[in-house]
Amino acid sequence: GVSEGFPFDETTLVFKVMGKIFCIADLEGNTGIALKNTPEKIMEMREEWPCITPASHLSHIHWNNIGDTFTIPATLLKSWIDDSYHIVVKGLTRKLQEELKNMPYSSNEQIE
């Protein structure tokens, strides 16, 4: 269900679930990571954290860029990544959701 790759360039790691992007990470550390969320949560995150801005080249309504991930507590960052994953899964077709649900996972691949 989850894959990772470099579809844009050699320093931008993209995570997908069933072919749909849920996380984009700049491995050089220049722009941080981009995550999807609900429009309400997007605005709340931007108001609370100065390092969070609208994501470049993505819908500003649904995507945030977290510029300095080191200022965010690790548990909160993990929670936002999980939220992004689940929002994308919720937007999948029923058929793809069913395929994902029925996929076997090894212990190190499972996403909670």
Regions found by a protein language model. Give the residues of each.
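Charge-dense, helix-prone N-terminal extensions
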Residues: G1-E112
